[in-house]
């Protein structure tokens, strides 16, 4: 029978000093011997997705204590990618993921916690906590802060729905008036919560459902809705139940590595492909799989992308649907239900509810279960009131959206496309693969041949786009922005947004060893591996080279001979794999990250071989 980890510091005569300190935190005599559960919060006033989380930790903690556990809360950092975007702050975003994972490990192991409830929400916080959960392998439940309501404003006598990407695109368009930009800016982000589309934050919170590590509704229930409170309360109760099952009944099926199996990672990736999620999820799932000891690779993602259809098109891929609409259509359980009916998920995986995924779908899929309370749960909708308060409204749609022909979530027969919303491309420009979010690419440019225009940094690319250097037919190559080369693997939301602002959204492609925001759409290909700083062929491209992109055949190639490629490689080996004439101040902390970072095909995790 597994022994409580916390017994190390709560039991035995020689732990009198530790117990004295525990007592100073409020523990009583009868608390020693109960599971100590870490409530891992991420409240900050810097991030709208986390600004409402201040009281959530104590909400969960109170429920844990009612159920027979001892709750101890601590906080992690949280970076807002949207605020950090477009300047040097973005260099810190991806490294913060690993810092979060490490800090959770440090706190939990230093204090011998028995279990965790992870209260996350935004882009790198959920992945960082997920990596920590897989690394620590103690009972864990995720509960996120929830999505923001979609922005809405009236322009030209027409009500339109918005998100932060609309503000960025319009602001860079010289033909748009200041008054229009001001109206969009003030309306784009109306409430607390993670940005309202299927961007990275919401994609990752949805994937925790598919992995089985969070409760149904976690990825889609609005941050402002009163029903979300029950997810926090239930997480507090359920984590104590998981502790009992593991520590008292020796049931290891409740542990993260038992839940996060290869099949569970396939389920999560299949969901991501079906919903056209952020390409960043590829990076984070690969990293989490490595922490879990699961051999899940780019080749597996490529295989899944060829058979899983795209069943939903959500902002930023359309302005018709946002996360509030996904929830109305049955949320992630609705999407997984359609994948199940298509024979495309594994139903035997475990979940934190103690059920198999198949059993959970029987209970929570609105198509197969007509229970009135279930449908009421998925009718939870927006209030349209600006607020930073969680659980502040109880508005509901009149009906759920169960239209699987033309609705927000489609069935396989009526799929938006029979191939999924993400694709892996291979070729001499990316021997280890690169990623494109096909759900955001107009089918007219799924095959694209263009002329390379090369930039050694995101900043130079932005200047080139806004300065008119980038023309129709160009493939914009932004290199030395990978995990090692940046360092930090910046997101390229500004370059892709500015291409749209300049009327080039369907007339150009963009290739980078950096990554993209979940808000990116267009022919934007990222994660080119190996990256330039690791000797990848993207570092050998020259202005005027012809690049051929073929999404249907999953290919991306530089149209030069093998002899020419080899000659360029030999020349670059002599020069060194570093950007030419780039001025960038890089802190010691970022240099450490870059020194250990692997390329994106490995999840940009640390290269452990460097420690041997």
Swiss-Prot record:
Q: Which domain of life is it from?
A: Bacteria
- Protein name in the entry: Dihydroxy-acid dehydratase
User: Pfam families recorded for this chain?
Assistant: ILV_EDD_C, ILVD_EDD_N
The cofactor remark states:
Binds 1 [2Fe-2S] cluster per subunit. This cluster acts as a Lewis acid cofactor.
Which GO-annotated molecular functions does the record name? 2 iron, 2 sulfur cluster binding; dihydroxy-acid dehydratase activity; magnesium ion binding
Listed EC numbers: 4.2.1.9
Subunit relationships: Homodimer.
Give cofactor(s), names only.
[2Fe-2S] cluster; Mg(2+)
Q: In which pathway does it act?
A: Amino-acid biosynthesis; L-isoleucine biosynthesis; L-isoleucine from 2-oxobutanoate: step 3/4; Amino-acid biosynthesis; L-valine biosynthesis; L-valine from pyruvate: step 3/4
- What does the entry list as the binding residues for Mg(2+)? 81, 123-124, 491
Assigned keywords, A-Z: 2Fe-2S, Amino-acid biosynthesis, Branched-chain amino acid biosynthesis, Iron, Iron-sulfur, Lyase, Magnesium, Metal-binding
Report the top EC class in one word: lyase
Which NCBIfam families is this protein grouped with? ilvD, PRK12448.1
Q: Which residues bind [2Fe-2S] cluster per the record?
A: 122, 195
